[in-house]
Structure formats: structure tokens, C-alpha cells
Swiss-Prot record:
This is Complement component C7. The gene is C7. It is found in: Secreted; Target cell membrane. It comes from Sus scrofa. Residues 616-693 are annotated as: CCP 2. Residues 695-770 are annotated as: Factor I module (FIM) 1.
Length: 843
């Protein structure tokens, strides 16, 4: 976590003469809206954005209203999430995951559990005996806005274990936890530092300089000021009115509390959160700053590479400058009064420290021993936070107890602290045109940083430093100056004698000449005066008219660029590679498109893996083949189980086959991977056959959730269910709430799976939507005139479905699925309380 801090503002102002005239307030003004973005084929909406034309300053009003507008539209392109996944498994959402994660007992499809939806017990291979993740692990997957210091929406799927079974032990909780597949390392280690660190700053200008991180963009000489603390924006907002009236010194007292430390995996191995993956899919393949800027607003500028979990405390107190001046309190005296055994957390009787207490009380407008401050607290229980907003000067034990109570609660409710960041564009992958979108997101991030460059602000007087906060500019004043524009007071000491120059914003890029374009800036914001220093850096810069990376991608992925620049002819599907596949296979292959082959597990590719769609609409494929490097199992027939289960086996390893219950094995049971990479004995004629049973005298009558197989009633598979009533169900094994149907619940219970109707916890059931004839559920019929499905009357039910118990208007009654569906179709609120008929009422 950022340091826990007690910040004391010490004013050193006596009487000031007015140095400059007051600046008139400047109100924020919006610029015009940009054109509408391309219509999104998935959401069928388009957006547009308006930038700030004039930032509010000198006490002027901020801009009011939203930056974005959204409207419905008719798309001309399809939805990328509806495309296939090639050799990978496709979740219901459209996200692709490795087939090795299917039927492993974990829900690796984040929102829909599609990878576990159609698994028979004989197919399910639980990869671990533990599924409990570390507490608060979801915090490690959040995005982060480095400009505002705020955490944003989740970008990493912290719920997926990636098929791994890595465990970590918590000595505090005395329990084992299973690590997410995205986390490389997670350590439970509580670090509490009881010694506070004290730093003094002679002005808000010095403090702003220290607590900001300079970042130079790819545009040489451009400097952006980033907030390094999540509380910085709040600090400037809450102290703005006070800092207009006096010049203050600052004393910062720092400390840290940590409860756990984590390191996330490298970008190429991270699984994206489904919502973030969808937004990446929705991004247009053409550069549209509004669309990419909206993604930055939602998910931030960076993701977490590593960090700790803990809490943050910062409180600001103001000190009467005249009282401090009268007491002749020097810098060392102030530090001693706020540290060691005479800290504000402890009692002090020294004369000069008593004078500092009086100065604190005078600035607070109170004569009591209770000092109210401006707190900034992250982490810990909210009930303890309110007690950190004040100090009792005569009750150091009480101060210490309130602090200790809050610090102890950080273990239960931590936040991410001490984070190390990686740019968000590193996560752009696994979506169509990923390389192009990654480059565009990087470009959008630079434009986003440009919006917050202080060059947009008018100069502060007396050498003050301007910064952009939202839609306003704030001035941070040098020592002995104050006011909304730092217009009051005088510069003294090292700061007197001159005003350093500041850069204007870069101009727009000029026209291309000889393959290059140029832009410029001036050192006039403000110009240097009174012997001040000139700006550091170049007044102009040039670059190639066409981005080299973009040109390279235009060759590799021409289909991601405007249609006027790409061919309209396509190659057929690429030739198949024995024991191999095409990486990230798509549905169309325009002229110039390159593809890359890979081999299945147990094989290694020999030769050139790249093939190209030529102008003759034929594939140019070099010599390549997949060379066997291990023994691989053939496709196993239904019911046949292998042990150990591995994607491939090295020389000398054995595999043993067995059959599920009710089946017997025909053929050898154990096989050896030989030096020739062939199985010994040869793997053929190995199968599971049903054990002989006496012939049934008559065909049994099966339940609705059963089917007849080999003269026996067996459980159906969930996908064999037809139209059935939607319900919310709870998986008692994973404790997840899922959307199922009455039929699927019967089938799963028949298979021995423990699903119950959820009580008090709901899922999102599909709303009523128009369906074409041929897709009507039990409770709807086809309207010949409109060719659409419409609600039946209860008396028109042709297929009853299951008999269920339904609560209608507070009363339970038994009815068929069709009858219940009719009520729901007509808009009545019904609740399925049991997938079986209601229990008879007691007489």
C-alpha cells in the first residue's frame, strides 16, 4: 500500500503584500462532439465524445454533463464474438479457452460454465481436490488508472485455475487455498511497521512535485504529471478552499501495513476477464479515439503486475502560521514534536510542542483538545475509519487504540497497495485484429495523456505549477504565495528573482513532405521572465508519415484495414496439417493473409510454419510436418478411462485402461511407450462392453428425464432436453448460481449431481423476446399472420411438460410447465418453488 500518512500542514505566513492582481475565474467549456463511431455489430450502438475546449481555472466552474453519448444503430459488420474458435473450446459468451480445461471440474468459462455443462461423470476429471481461492484474490485482477490513481473494472479472470492445482498455506487462517491460474506467486505475510516516517515540504508546490511521477511519452520532451496516490485528487479537492487563503508547509508522516503479496503472470499467459475480453472484441479495427477512450475510462491505463494487499491512512491538519512564528518553532523542533516519543500519538509536555498544539487548535477554530482533520483512508472496516478523522491531544492511548483497531481490520478488508503496473495494451489478445487493436490502444493512451497535460492550463503566477484535475486546472503555489492563481504573497529566498518558462501544447501535425511530418511548440506558457530558466527540450519534432508498425501489420493482417485498401478476393480454407492445426483460425482468408501452423501435443513442427494466401487465390505453403516426440493416445471410445491422464507420454511410461461401472474391458489393460514412440502391445481392439444382463421381459416405461437404452431407462444428457421452463439453480459443489431449466435439473439430479433451486439468490433469466415460428417453446404457438411466436392460452397447451410447484400471488399450486410458461409469457410474476408437484396440504 501507499504509505499510511498523517499529514500536518504548517503555515508560515505572517503578513503578505499583494504581488500580482487577482486572475478572473475561467469556466470550463465543452468542445463540439466528434462524429459518431462505427456501429458496433455486437451491441448495435454507436458512441461519440466531446473533449474539453477550455479547462476551468482560477475558481471557475467545472464542465457539467457526460463526455460520451450513445445511440442505437444498424450495424454493417457482424459481431466478432460470434466467430469460431478453431481447435479451441468456445464458451457460450464466444470466448475461447484451451480444450484441456473442458470437463476438469472447474468453471473456466467465467460467466456460463459451458466447459462443464455437458460432462458426464465418466468424462469429468477433477484437476484438484481444492477449489477455494485466497481471500480478496479478485482485487489482483483490477485495472488501474495511473492518472487518477483509481482502480477500475476487472481485466483478469481471477476465478479460473487454469487447470492447475497450486496451493498456498495461510498461517494466520490455518488453511490451504488454491491459486488462480493468473497468479504466479501469492504470499501470506503480514508486515506492520510501528515506526512512522516524517517528511516536511515547504509548500504545496513542493509536495505536488514530490508525490507526482514524471512520465515522458513517445513524443520527445512531453512531460505528464501522474498522481502516485489514490487520494491525491481528493486531497486537492478538499484543501482547495483553504489553500486559497494562506501559504502552508506540509509535514507528512508515513507508514505501511501489508497482509499479503502477489505477482501476476506474464501477459501471454494471463486469462482475460470475460467482460474485458468482450470490450476488446467490440473495439473497431479502424482507429476511433472515442471507442478506445471509452475502454480506458472503464478499465484504466494499466493492469497490476504485482503488489501487496493492505490499507492506507492519511489525515491533514492545518497549523496557525502566526502561532508557529511566535513560538520560533524550527524545522528540527517540528520534526521532534511529531516523532519518536513525543509524537501526536503520545503525550508531550515540551514547551515548544505545546505551542504547536495551540497553533493546531487555533487553525481548527477550537479550544478543545479534539482536532478534526481531513482523512484519506483505504482498506479496513468502515466502522473504524470514522475514528481516524480526529486526534485527542490529551488522550494518546485513545489515538493509538483507534489506529490499532483500524490496522487490525485491514486483514479482513484490504485493498491493493504498492502496486507495480504494466500498460493495459499488453493484454490485447485473443480477439480479431488483436495486433492492430494493441497498437491503436497504445496510440489512444498517448492521446488520453495529452488531455491531462498541464499545457492546457493557463499559467499560474509567481512560478506556481498547474495540473489538470478532471475538467479543471489547479495551481500549486511556491512557498509564501497563495490564492487561486498563486497571485498573493511574495517569492523569497531561492525561489525569488525569476519565473521559469513552460511549454505550450504541441501543434497539430503538419502536411507530409518527403515522407515526414512535423509539429512544434513554444516556450510561452508562461514565457521565462526576470532571469528565469528557459524550457528544456526541442521546439519541434518530426516523424514518418506512416507508422512503421502499422505498415508491417497492413502486410500481415490486411483484412483489418479499410476495404478500399484490401482485396475483395479470398483463398479457400488452408490445407490441413497432419497432427497439427492453424493458430487462431478465422473464417475468411483475404489475399495477402498469413497464417501460422502448430502441432498437436506430443508433436513438434519441422519446417516453415507460415503459409500465405497468394494473388492466385492459392496457398503458398513451405515444407513442414509434425514430428512425433512422444506417444499419444488415440481417441478413446466412450466409457474407456486412462490412468494417468496426460496429453502425451515419454519413452518408458505406461498407461492403464479401465471401464466405468457396468462395463467390462476387452483386450489388454496396460501399454508401454516404446523407444520407437509406438505403444506396446499395439493399441487395437481395446474397448468397453456392457456386462451381460438377462433380457428384459418388457420395455420399461421411462420418466421424462430418462431415455431408453439397451432396454433400460438411463438418464438423458442435459443437451437432450427440449423446451423447458427457465429456473435459477445452485450447484452445491461449487456454490455457483446458474441458469438451468426444469428438465436439465431433473437430468442432472438423475445423474447424481447436487443441484437445488436457489432461494434468495437469483440469476438473470432471459426476458421475453420475439422468436420466429419453428422455435416456439411449449407455452407459445405460431401466429401465421406475423410468422412469430405468441403466447398460448392455458387451455391450448398441447405438450404439458413436467408438473411443477409454482407460487402465484403468494399461493403455491401445482401446474404443468406449459401452464406456468403461459403465465410468465403474459407478464405475470411467478416463482418455481419445486421442480416436482406441490406437497399436499396437511388436513
Amino acid at each position: 500500500m501507499k504509505a499510511m500518512s498523517l499529514v500536518f500542514l504548517v503555515g508560515l505566513i505572517g503578513e503578505f503584500q499583494v504581488f500580482s492582481s487577482a486572475s478572473s475565474p475561467v469556466n470550463c467549456q465543452w468542445d463540439s462532439y466528434a462524429p459518431w463511431s462505427e456501429c458496433n455489430g455486437c451491441t448495435k450502438t454507436q458512441t461519440r465524445r466531446r473533449p474539453v475546449a477550455v479547462y476551468g481555472q482560477y475558481g471557475g466552474h467545472p464542465c457539467v454533463g457526460s463526455t460520451f453519448e450513445t445511440q442505437s444503430c444498424e450495424p454493417t459488420r457482424g459481431c466478432p464474438t460470434e466467430e469460431g474458435c478453431g481447435e479451441r473450446f468456445r464458451c457460450f459468451s464466444g470466448q475461447c479457452i484451451s480444450k484441456s480445461l473442458v470437463c476438469n471440474g472447474d468453471s473456466d468459462c467465467e460467466e456460463d460454465s459451458a466447459d462443464e455443462d455437458r460432462c458426464e461423470d465418466s468424462e469429468s476429471r477433477p484437476s484438484c481436490d481444492l477449489s477455494k481461492p485466497p481471500p480478496n484474490i479478485e482485487l489482483t485482477g483490477n485495472g488501474y488508472n495511473a492518472l487518477t490513481g483509481q482502480f477500475r473494472n476487472r481485466v483478469l479472470n481471477t476465478k479460473s485455475f487454469g487447470g492447475q492445482c497450486r496451493k498456498v498455506f495461510s498461517g494466520d487462517g490455518r488453511d490451504f487455498y488454491r491459486l488462480s491460474g493468473n497468479v504466479l506467486s501469492y504470499t501470506f505475510q503480514v508486515k506492520v511497521n510501528n515506526d512512522f516516517n516524517y517528511e516536511f515540504y515547504n509548500s504545496t508546490w513542493s509536495y505536488a512535485k514530490h508525490t507526482s511521477t514524471e512520465h515522458t511519452s513517445s513524443s520527445k520532451g512531453r512531460v505528464f504529471i501522474f498522481s502516485s496516490s489514490s487520494s491525491s485528487s481528493s486531497y486537492y479537492a478538499k484543501t482547495y478552499e483553504i489553500l486559497k487563503k494562506k501559504s502552508y508547509q506540509l509535514l507528512v508522516v508515513q507508514n505501511t501495513v501489508e497482509v499479503a503479496q502477489f505477482i501476476n503472470n506474464n501477459p501471454e499467459f494471463l486469462q482475460l476477464a470475460e467482460s474485458f475480453w468482450k470490450e476488446l472484441s467490440y473495439l473497431p479495427p479502424l482507429y476511433d479515439y472515442s471507442a478506445y477512450r471509452r475502454l480506458i475510462d472503464q478499465y484504466g491505463t494499466h493492469y497490476l503486475q504485482s503488489g501487496s494487499l493492505g490499507g492506507e491512512y492519511k489525515v491533514l491538519f492545518y497549523v496557525d502560521s502566526e502561532k508557529v512564528a511566535e513560538s520560533d518553532l524550527g524545522s528540527e523542533d517540528k520534526k521532534k514534536c511529531a516523532s519518536s516519543h513525543i509524537s501526536f500519538l503520545f503525550k508531550s509536555s515540551k514547551h515548544k510542542c505545546k505551542a504547536m498544539e495551540e497553533a493546531l487548535k487555533s487553525a481548527s477554530g477550537t479550544q478543545s483538545n479534539v482536532l478534526r482533520g481531513v482523512p484519506f483512508v483505504r482498506g479496513g472496516r468502515p466502522g473504524f475509519v470514522s475514528g481516524l478523522s480526529y486526534l485527542e491531544l490529551d488522550n494518546p492511548d485513545g489515538n493509538k487504540q483507534r489506529y490499532s483497531s483500524w490496522a487490525g481490520s485491514v486483514t479482513d478488508l484490504p485493498q491493493v497497495i504498492k502496486q507495480k503496473l504494466t500498460p493495459l495494451y499488453e493484454l490485447v489478445k485473443e480477439v480479431p485484429c488483436a495486433s492492430v487493436k494493441r497498437l491503436y490502444l497504445k496510440r489512444a493512451l498517448e492521446e488520453y495523456l495529452d488531455e491531462f497535460d498541464s499545457c492546457h492550463c493557463q499559467p499560474c503566477q509567481n512560478g506556481g505549477m498547474a495540473s489538470v484535475e478532471g475538467t479543471q486546472c489547479q495551481c500549486h503555489c511556491k512557498p509564501n504565495t497563495f490564492g487561486v492563481a498563486c497571485e498573493q504573497g511574495v517569492l523569497v529566498g531561492d525561489h525569488a528573482g525569476g519565473i521559469d518558462g513552460g511549454w505550450s501544447c504541441w501543434s497539430s501535425w503538419g502536411p507530409c513532405a518527403q515522407g515526414k511530418k512535423t509539429r512544434s511548440r513554444k516556450c510561452n506558457n508562461p514565457p521565462p521572465s526576470g532571469g528565469g530558466k528557459s524550457c528544456i527540450g526541442e521546439t519541434s519534432e518530426s516523424r514518418q508519415c506512416e507508422d512503421e508498425d502499422l505498415e508491417h501489420l497492413r502486410l500481415l493482417e490486411p483484412h483489418c484495414f479499410p476495404l478500399s485498401l484490401v482485396p475483395t478476393e479470398f483463398c479457400p480454407s488452408p490445407p490441413a496439417l497432419k497432427d497439427g492445426f492453424v493458430q487462431n483460425e478465422e473464417t475468411t482468408f483475404p489475399v495477402g493473409k498469413n497464417i501460422v501452423y502448430s502441432c498437436n501435443e506430443g508433436y513438434s513442427l519441422v519446417g516453415d510454419p507460415v503459409a500465405r494466401c497468394g494473388e492466385d487465390l492459392q496457398w503458398t505453403v513451405g515444407k513442414m510436418h509434425c514430428q512425433k516426440i512422444a506417444c499419444v493416445l488415440p481417441t478413446l471410445m466412450r466409457g474407456l478411462q486412462s490412468h494417468p491422464q496426460k496429453p502425451f507420454y515419454t519413452v518408458g511410461e505406461k498407461v492403464t485402461f479401465s471401464c466405468s461401472s457396468g462395463m467390462s474391458l476387452e483386450g489388454p489393460s496396460t501399454f508401454l511407450c516404446g523407444s520407437s514412440l509406438k505403444w506396446s502391445p499395439e493399441m487395437k481392439n481395446v474397448q468397453c462392453v456392457r456386462k451381460e444382463a438377462p433380457l428384459a421381459k418388457k420395455v420399461p416405461e421411462c420418466q421424462l428425464w430418462e431415455k431408453l437404452q439397451n432396454s433400460k431407462c438411463v438418464c438423458k444428457m442435459p443437451y437432450e432436453c427440449g423446451s423447458s421452463l427457465d429456473v435459477c439453480a445452485r450447484d452445491e459443489r461449487s456454490k455457483r448460481i446458474l441458469r438451468l431449466t426444469v428438465c436439465k435439473m431433473h437430468v442432472l439430479q438423475c445423474q447424481g449431481r447436487n443441484y437445488t433451486l436457489s432461494v434468495g439468490e437469483t440469476c438473470t433469466l432471459p426476458g421475453s423476446a420475439e422468436k420466429a415460428c419453428g422455435a416456439c417453446p411449449l407455452w407459445e404457438k405460431c401466429d401465421a399472420q406475423s410468422s412469430k411466436c405468441v403466447c398460448r392460452a392455458a387451455s391450448e397447451c398441447e405438450e404439458a411438460g413436467f408438473r411443477v410447484c409454482v407460487e402465484v400471488n403468494g399461493r403455491e399450486q401445482t401446474m404443468t410447465e406449459c401452464e406456468a410458461g403461459v403465465l410468465r409469457c403474459l407478464g405475470l410474476s411467478i416463482t418455481v418453488t419445486s421442480i416436482r408437484p406441490c406437497a399436499p396440504e396437511a388436513p
